Regions:
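Glycine-rich phosphate-binding loop and adjoining beta1-alpha1-beta2 segment
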Residues: 1-39
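Metal-dependent de-N-acetylase/amidase catalytic core
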Residues: 9-20, 64-233
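Active-site/substrate-binding loop(s) of hydrolase catalytic cores
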Residues: 26-83
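Active-site donor-binding loop signature of nucleotide-sugar glycosyltransferases
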Residues: 42, 166, 388
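Short, well-ordered, mixed-charge alpha-helical segments that flank or form enzyme active sites
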Residues: 48, 108-111, 368
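A structural motif
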Residues: 219-570
Length: 570
């Protein structure tokens, strides 16, 4: 990854942190690249058999560090709950990251039985018992850093976050194609090391349980998937009355809005803060029938630990009038009455209907679907459960050619589908679709040129997707991985009224790609700038000022715009 010999020496030093804590830091530089590792060295099992879950949840818990052989750190440190939060927040403030990766703070509930052995899971959940508190400490530190920076600097720090599922990967279909899996395996092999490596470190040369071919041979298959806890596409693009591209996203755990500097300029201005945080990187946006923008987000309503509540809630921000100011954020709660179940609620998905209603959908703690509807008069109805089971997060909500609501989700067995039978009617679970088993990433869906609903997704471990509508068709050249977005657009040939399906996603190297059409001769187009988004890119396709726009967020927390032309070369 650094372009250096795997045994290149690291520069070791001591870092002094809040609370009198000291940590070891290792630095490696190679040309324009550099890496810094900070080892807090909190013991997995501290004095008295104390583990990090107790440091999160039990007041008064203290854990000691474990000094590594040969470490420049001379004395162990002690961590209480707030000490660890202060240390993490201090590290963030010192180094000002633009992208923070975390573990899953709210893992799925998991039944453990003969068919689903517990293995390395914590009781009742699909992740390791240490992963969850580490993620919670990180998110609490993020919130503290943002609050302190905002008070000091009058603005929130600019960064984005990505949270990864953990042992969840064992429980669901694998979603990485062979080429991407091979890249991941090479990195993990280097991390795992081997006892016979001559690395010059008396403490050892890797996490040997992850070395060699062990991860690929492990029946649990953790390596064979990469699932996001918040699998939405951000930023979410739309347009304003002047024809400028507008994008909504989450930056520094706060909602923000970017506007294009001028119609068609291809550049966003500075972000405008909309507040609402601390928010997960999960945002859904719709424009209601009156032209007002409505934003939905998932908020960390409480990150207390130490025996206090950890709460999540869906929140909404609504414009007073088209292109006008926003009202205050409003909490919509969750469909769950128990806070522990509320933590497992998924990312919001929404769709606006011509009758003035706005339909909000979320995945529930029991892996089904729930909805809440804003009526045309602006009043929100109660949460309602719509049934279903064993779906993954990453819902797709859209209207069909008749204006009826559809919701689609990747299930363990097939695609799960809810829909209206008539305009204004309830959204209800449909009979099993019988479609091939999805790999688990969010599904692409659009009204096809023939007026039917077309679904686009990859099956487990597949490199190319298929389009499922009246018939099924493999999209043979659209090689990649992850979520796919779809939209029907004007055909590049320019023939009057001719339409085709447009796809956007990531190629096998993670770069954004689009493809006009799904036939055997259609080829993907890639951006001249080799744009690589954090998470999934978003697609806007309209018949007005914008045409086709792809929007994404770079690792430096800067949004970009790509307006692909059908003549671009792959």
């Amino acid at each position: 990854m650094m372009g250096l010999n795997q045994f290149a020496p690291w520069q070791r030093s001591v870092l002094r942190l809040p609370g009198g804590v000291t940590a070891e830091t290792n630095t490696l530089a190679g040309g324009a690249r550099s890496a810094r590792l900070i080892f807090l060295n909190i013991a997995m099992l501290s004095d008295g058999g104390v583990r990090i879950p107790a440091l999160w949840s039990t007041p008064g818990t203290v854990m000691r560090t474990l000094l590594a052989t040969g470490s420049p750190v001379a004395h162990p440190s002690s961590y209480g709950h707030q000490t660890l939060v202060d240390v993490l927040a201090g590290i963030m403030d010192r180094y000002r990251p633009t992208l923070i990766h975390t573990l899953d703070p709210d893992p799925d509930f998991q039944v453990h039985d003969l068919l689903h052995p517990k293995d390395n899971d914590q009781p009742g959940c699909s992740d390791h018992r240490d992963h969850t508190p580490v993620a919670l400490f990180t998110w609490k530190a993020i919130a503290q850093w943002v609050a302190a920076s905002t008070r000091r600097d009058k603005s929130a720090p600019r960064f984005t976050t990505t949270a990864f599922r953990g042992y969840y990967n064992q429980r669901w279909p694998h979603n990485l194609p062979p080429a991407v899996l091979a890249q991941k395996a090479r990195v993990i092999k280097s991390y795992g090391g081997a006892p016979d490596w001559d690395c010059g470190n008396a403490a050892g040369c890797g996490d040997y349980s992850q070395g060699g071919l062990r991860p690929l041979r492990n029946r649990k298959g953790w390596i064979r998937s990469t699932h996001y806890r918040y699998p939405t596409s951000l930023p979410a693009p739309t347009t304003d009355a002047q024809g400028r591209l507008v994008a909504y996203g989450v930056l520094g755990t706060q909602a923000v809005r970017w506007r294009e500097t001028a119609p068609g300029s291809g550049r966003f201005g500075a972000p405008r803060g909309l507040g609402g945080g601390p928010l997960a990187p999960a945002l859904a946006t719709v424009r209601d029938s009156a032209g007002r923008q409505v934003l939905f987000a998932l908020r960390f309503a409480a990150l207390a630990g130490q025996g206090a509540g950890d709460l999540r809630e869906i929140v909404v921000l609504e414009q007073r009038r088209p292109d006008g100011p926003f009202r205050a954020w409003t909490g919509l709660g969750t469909p769950e009455s128990d806070p522990e179940h509320g933590r497992r609620v998924g990312c919001p998905a929404a769709v606006a209907t011509p009758d003035g209603r706005v339909h909000l959908f979320v995945r529930t703690a029991d892996k089904g679907l729930a909805t809440r509807v804003r009526e045309a008069n602006g009043r929100w109805g109660p949460w309602q459960r719509l049934g279903g089971t064993e779906i993954q997060d990453g819902l797709t909500a859209l209207l069909d050619a008749e204006g009826l609501v559809h919701v689609l989700a990747p299930g363990r067995d097939t695609v799960h589908h809810w829909a209206q039978e008539r305009a204004g009617g309830p959204v209800a679970l449909r009979r099993p679709s019988g479609l091939p088993r999805p790999g688990g990433d969010p599904l692409g869906a659009a009204v096809a040129p023939d007026g039917t609903l077309a679904l686009v997704y990859r099956t487990p471990t597949a490199t190319v997707p298929a389009v499922h509508g009246e018939t099924s068709l493999t999209v043979r050249h659209f090689e990649g991985y992850g979520a796919i977005a779809a939209h029907t657009v004007a055909e590049p040939s320019g023939r009057r009224e001719a339409k085709t399906l447009l796809l956007v996603g990531r190629d096998l190297g993670g770069e954004v790609q689009v493809q006009y059409g799904t036939g055997p001769d259609a080829k993907p187009l890639r951006s001249p700038g080799h744009l690589t988004p954090v998470g999934a890119p978003a697609l806007l396709a309209d018949d007005g000022h914008q045409g086709v726009c792809v929007v994404g967020l770079s690792p430096d927390a800067t949004p970009w715009i790509w307006r692909p032309r059908p003549t671009s070369r792959a």
